[in-house]
Amino acid sequence: MKTVLWVIAGLIAVVALGVLVLYIGGSRLPREHRSQLTVTLRASRAAVWTALTDYAAMPQWWPAVKAVRMGQMPDGTELTFNMDKHGQEIPFRTVESRPNEKLVRMIANDQLPFGGTWSYELADAENGGTRLTLTEDGFINPPVFRAMAKWFLGLDTTQRDYLQHLEQHLAEKK
């Protein structure tokens, strides 16, 4: 019985030490981050723009979003509520919209442990394609989450997943 208690105490100590290391390490990382990726898509700017702004269709091609609900802020600004695969609704609002050129979307909830903007910049590419640059200017408040994102998950993992599924979606539409 004493051996079992020592093993349990040892496991608890290892987990606590791991969390402490993540907390201290995360506290030393910057709260803000920037991640930028560029892809060339085999679709016109208009087709890419439609895919980016047809929020209701997003769950059909991006598995990270299970549902989208439309809404409005008190000032009339359009909101979308994206339900993620964990059932959490995250509100987004459009900060800037220049059709076929630039779209900036922002998380519209300052109570979340993370936030920021995604900026989409579209430019002509060879053969009628589109060069899409996706920039995340974000922040992560909890130091443990910051460390996990930086060291284990990757700060650009969601962007990479999004762009991969967007590219597949546009290829299927041809």
What do these predicted regions represent?
Residues 4-7, 14-73:
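Hydrophobic ligand-binding cavity/cleft-lining segments
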Residues 38-40, 121-123, 133-137:
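Residue-level recognition of well-ordered beta-strand positions that form the cores
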Residues 40, 60, 69-117, 126-131, ...:
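Glycine-rich portal/gate segments that line the openings of hydrophobic small-molecule binding cavities
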Residues 40, 50, 86, 114, ...:
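Extracytoplasmic/periplasmic, Sec-exported soluble proteins
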Residues 3-20, 131, 137-174:
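A conserved amphipathic terminal alpha-helix motif
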Residues 45, 49-55, 62, 91, ...:
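Extracytoplasmic/secreted envelope proteins and their assembly/folding machinery
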Residues 53, 130-133:
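Ser/Thr-centric signal marking residues that sit
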Residues 56, 89, 139:
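Short alpha-helical
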